[in-house]
């Protein structure tokens, strides 16, 4: 079943704040550099790659020497403004070391919900990919708000990555997190916790296993990753949740190794005939 992943041509890689940042709030440059190397090499191999990256607020907090995320919207958005600029500078530097060009794409929920602007986003991503450029997608935290009549926030980049995967008809979404996969119990409290190798259906029992919030600098948790998996499976797409501590694990996934948890409908798990 994992063997079919070798044929994946178009990939969406999602990396969370917990992977990009140390627990002390500093930027994990080692991981970011490895990620740039891996994705650049996948491009050299002929794969099409889109990176959905969190971290604007976390990097902004580091840049501004803040001990924690601000709680009010204007301060959060100001920090995101600083952080997104710094984050893209870091990415551009490391990807540039491997001769890989990247392009920034900032989205809000209303843009991908509205048909005309959604088509524009799809065309932009297709144009970038056709030129061998790796789009780096993030939510536009500087302007995104959540109001009663005008919702522009995705809520988290887990869902955003699934939406992007659907927009570009990706063959595989790889979600890099701070956990090895989806477990039957909490691995931080249960040393004997068993990890699912594959999930073919999101049942109420599976939903009940999802925990709470993520890191202190991020917004996601296991529940949001499960929501992203549900979104992917509804689109007949595959998603793998795995640990992003060492991004070279992506190479293992692309070789069909049994790492992380694969979310795929039963028939999709064995098939791979998507074309672009």
From Swiss-Prot:
Enzyme nomenclature, EC number: 2.7.2.11
Catalytic activity: L-glutamate + ATP = L-glutamyl 5-phosphate + ADP
Keyword Plastid on entry: no
Primary subcellular site in the record, as a coarse category: cytoplasm
Residues annotated to bind substrate: 54, 141, 157
SUPFAM superfamilies, sorted: Carbamate kinase-like (SSF53633)
Keywords associated with the record: Amino-acid biosynthesis, ATP-binding, Cytoplasm, Kinase, Nucleotide-binding, Proline biosynthesis, Transferase
Pathway given in the UniProt record: Amino-acid biosynthesis; L-proline biosynthesis; L-glutamate 5-semialdehyde from L-glutamate: step 1/2
Enzyme class per UniProt: transferase
Pfam families attached to this UniProt entry: AA_kinase (PF00696)
Localization: Cytoplasm
Gene Ontology molecular function terms on file: ATP binding; glutamate 5-kinase activity
The keyword Amino-acid biosynthesis is assigned to this record: yes
Amino-acid positions noted as binding ATP in the UniProt annotation, renumbered to this chain: 14, 177-178, 219-225
CDD domains on file: AAK_G5K_ProB (cd04242)
Cellular component per GO, a single term: cytosol
Gene Ontology BP terms: L-proline biosynthetic process
Family: Belongs to the glutamate 5-kinase family.
Function: Catalyzes the transfer of a phosphate group to glutamate to form L-glutamate 5-phosphate.
Protein name in the entry: Glutamate 5-kinase
Organism from which the protein derives: Listeria welshimeri serovar 6b (strain ATCC 35897 / DSM 20650 / CCUG 15529 / CIP 8149 / NCTC 11857 / SLCC 5334 / V8)
């Amino acid at each position: 079943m994992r063997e079919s992943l070798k044929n994946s041509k178009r990939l969406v890689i999602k990396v969370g704040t917990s992977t990009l940042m140390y627990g002390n709030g500093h930027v994990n440059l080692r991981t970011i550099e490895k990620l740039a190397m891996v994705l650049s090499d996948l491009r050299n191999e002929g794969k099409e790659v889109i990176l959905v990256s969190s971290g604007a607020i976390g990097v902004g907090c580091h840049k501004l020497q803040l001990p924690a995320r601000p709680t009010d919207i204007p301060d959060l958005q100001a920090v995101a403004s600083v952080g997104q600029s710094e984050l893209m500078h870091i990415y551009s530097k490391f990807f540039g070391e491997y001769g890989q060009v990247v392009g920034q794409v900032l989205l809000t929920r209303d843009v991908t919900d509205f048909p005309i602007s959604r088509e524009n986003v799809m065309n932009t991503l297709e144009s970038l990919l056709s030129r061998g450029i790796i789009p780096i997608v993030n939510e536009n935290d500087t302007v995104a708000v959540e109001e009663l009549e005008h919702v522009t926030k995705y809520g988290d980049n887990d869902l955003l990555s699934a939406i992007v995967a659907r927009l570009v008809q990706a063959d595989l979404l790889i979600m890099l997190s701070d956990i090895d996969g989806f477990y039957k119990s909490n691995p931080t409290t249960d040393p004997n916790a068993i990890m699912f190798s594959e999930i073919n259906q999101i049942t109420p029992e599976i939903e009940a296993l999802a925990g709470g919030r993520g890191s202190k600098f991020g917004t996601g948790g296991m529940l949001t990753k499960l929501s992203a998996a549900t979104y992917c499976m509804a689109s007949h797409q595959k998603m793998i949740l795995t640990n992003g501590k060492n991004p070279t694990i992506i190479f293992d996934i692309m070789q069909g190794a049994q790492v992380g948890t694969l979310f795929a409908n039963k028939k999709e798990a064995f098939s791979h005939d998507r074309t672009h």
